[in-house]
């Protein structure tokens, strides 16, 4: 997880673009190349004066969900927690067999951090096993609200999937009480035992990073890895 990656643009006057600052600090500290997983906005890699390997955790997460719903994939609907991540949800739906797609319409108060209100579901989720996908869970307000509106819209179940589990403040309690069948995260952010519960699954991102590092240091062709997506479990990764 790249720190301050969500602050990649100004939402109002006099706000800093902290994501650019972090890249500049890494460059000043001596970094020649950056490798990161699921940046909040892929275009922010342009802030760094040097090569950036933007890895995507989707294959690791998709493999797990495919195995989890192996006998009922035809009933899975992929849901984006907001309109801004609908393209990611489309990629998820494609890799899970082309099932239905939906997103949660929400409004956000830009003067207050981590304040968003989930209003309604756009798309048909009634009777569906919903997979709610996001890049990062911080205070879990958005995700908990999305779970609530999905349940109100008739969803059979909701499984929350995200790459980065920051889990700050009330996040754990919100997720426990959200009604989600399961919360699936990766270990890009260490999750201590006191923030774990029975409904949480944490997947290792180590094989993804190891494969990318090997490609870089053995002078392999990173470009050839961009479209790699094996059909069997446990290997491969994507770049963006």
What role is predicted for each listed range?
Residues 1-240:
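PRPP-associated nucleotide enzymes
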């Amino acid at each position: 997880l790249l720190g301050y990656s969500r602050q990649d643009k100004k939402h109002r006057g006099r706000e800093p673009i902290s994501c650019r600052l972090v890249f500049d600090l890494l460059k000043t500290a001596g970094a020649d190349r950056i490798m990161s997983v699921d940046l909040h906005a892929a275009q922010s890699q342009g802030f760094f004066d040097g090569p950036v390997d933007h890895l995507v955790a989707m294959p690791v997460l998709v493999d797990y969900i495919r195995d989890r719903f192996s006998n009922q994939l035809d009933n899975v609907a992929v849901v984006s927690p907001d309109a801004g991540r609908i393209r990611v949800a489309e990629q998820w739906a494609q890799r899970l067999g082309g099932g239905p797609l939906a997103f949660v319409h929400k409004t956000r108060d830009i003067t207050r951090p981590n304040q968003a209100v989930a209003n309604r579901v756009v798309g048909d989720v009634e009777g569906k096993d919903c997979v709610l996908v996001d890049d990062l869970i911080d205070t879990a307000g958005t995700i908990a609200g999305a779970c609530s509106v999905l349940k109100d819209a008739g969803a059979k179940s909701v499984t929350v999937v995200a790459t980065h589990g920051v889990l700050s403040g009330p996040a754990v309690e919100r997720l426990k009480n959200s009604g989600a069948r399961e919360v699936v995260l990766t270990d890009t952010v260490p999750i201590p035992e006191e923030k774990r519960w029975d409904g949480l699954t944490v997947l290792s991102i180590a094989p993804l990073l190891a494969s990318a590092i090997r490609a870089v240091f053995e002078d392999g062709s990173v470009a050839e890895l961009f479209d790699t997506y094996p059909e069997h479990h446990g290997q491969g990764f994507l770049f963006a």
